[in-house]
UniProtKB/Swiss-Prot annotation:
Originating species: Psychromonas ingrahamii (strain DSM 17664 / CCUG 51855 / 37)
Pathway assigned in UniProt: Pyrimidine metabolism; dUMP biosynthesis; dUMP from dCTP (dUTP route): step 1/2
GO biological process: dUMP biosynthetic process; dUTP biosynthetic process; nucleobase-containing small molecule interconversion
Positions annotated to bind dCTP: 110-115, 128, 136-138, 171, 178, 182
Keyword terms of this UniProt record: Hydrolase, Nucleotide metabolism, Nucleotide-binding
Protein family membership: Belongs to the dCTP deaminase family.
Gene that encodes it: dcd
Record carries keyword Hydrolase: yes
Name of the protein: dCTP deaminase
EC class: hydrolase
Length: 194
């Protein structure tokens, strides 16, 4: 069952879903909560790496990732991060989100931003039961003009579904939970896959 606005507010009041800072009522609509953009970004830096063998030896994958990803870029609240056409950037939500073992979250981009060519999450829009932390966004500008992104602008909507039962292996109890409690624009940790 997908939660409606009334139930989202009840779950927030009860502490079953935790979003910090707590969104105002105006950010909660029919079936979703507006989520804002944080101030940390990462991009692909200039490099000479010809490719990354995603199924290669973990040490080689790790080394390649270190070469291609920038250090975190922190943007002041009144400044903009410019995402140019054809560029991918990682960013992070302003809010921390914590879900219980029986709720899955779904992150959706905003239609108004998509109409300008901004993809807010390239593919990863599921927020697992047991998740806690800031959500990393995978931005891609598929449009034809640069887009100025500002910290704390509304960037996406998060909605929630109640599972048929609590998950037996929620994210916070998995040994391989490589992004649990992330607070920044964490780069890919594919080298930690089993």
């Amino acid at each position: 069952m997908r939660l409606c606005d009334t139930h989202i507010e009840e779950y927030l009041d009860a502490g079953k879903i935790v979003i910090t800072p707590r969104p105002p009522k105006s950010a909660i609509s029919g079936v979703s909560v507006d989520i804002r953009l944080g101030n940390e970004f990462r991009v692909f830096s200039e490099h000479t790496t010809p490719y990354i063998d995603l199924s290669g030896p973990k040490e080689e994958v790790s080394s390649a990732l270190d070469k291609v990803m920038s250090e975190p870029i922190i943007i002041a609240k009144n400044e903009s991060f410019f995402l140019h056409p054809g560029e991918l950037a990682l960013a992070v939500t302003y809010e921390n989100v914590t879900l219980p073992d029986d709720i899955v979250g779904w992150l959706d981009g905003r239609s108004s931003l998509a109409r300008l060519g901004l993809m807010v999450h390239v593919t990863a829009h599921r927020i697992d039961p047991g998740w806690s932390g800031k959500i990393v966004l995978e931005f891609y500008n598929s449009g034809k003009i640069p887009l100025a992104l500002r910290p704390e602008m509304t960037i996406a909507a998060l909605n929630f579904e109640v599972l048929s039962a609590p998950a037996a292996r929620p994210y916070n109890k998995r040994v391989d939970a490589k992004y649990q409690v992330q607070q920044g624009a964490v780069a890919s940790r594919i080298n930690q896959d089993n």
